[in-house]
Amino acid sequence: MPQKHILVVDDDQNILALIKTILSQKDFRVSTALNGEAAVSLLQKDKFDAIITDAMMPQMDGNALAQSVKNDPKLKDLPIIMVTASKEVDLVKKSFSSGCVLFLPKPFTAASLLSLLQLVLK
């Protein structure tokens, strides 16, 4: 089975490194971006199987990224997992209405991240 390619987007380099390590150990191919704009650029250059994105980032946040993906006919079916430390119900609702399929609250475990990713990749 070919390696699944995951795009991880977060403005915190420590979180990016953590998620990349978790996924790489499970044989995923991982690309990273520090903000939504960089993610959009990567999405235009390469093929991905899923996106894991932080909700709150400067410039283009996770919801704006999700909306951009869902408005692109070539990317609209790409599953998006939103990750955030925020517990605001409005943010969760906005994430789903933007096009995210799952929501992962921080802090999270490697097992919970991998379980959600497996769900969206089926």
Predicted regions and their residues:
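Charged docking surfaces used in two-component/phosphorelay signaling
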Residues: 17-25
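Acidic, metal-coordinating helix/loop segments flanking the phosphotransfer/catalytic sites
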Residues: 32-50
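Receiver (REC) domain active-site loop signature in two-component systems and cognate sites
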Residues: 57
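A Lys-centered signature of the CheY-like receiver
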Residues: 104-106
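C-terminal output helix
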Residues: 108-117
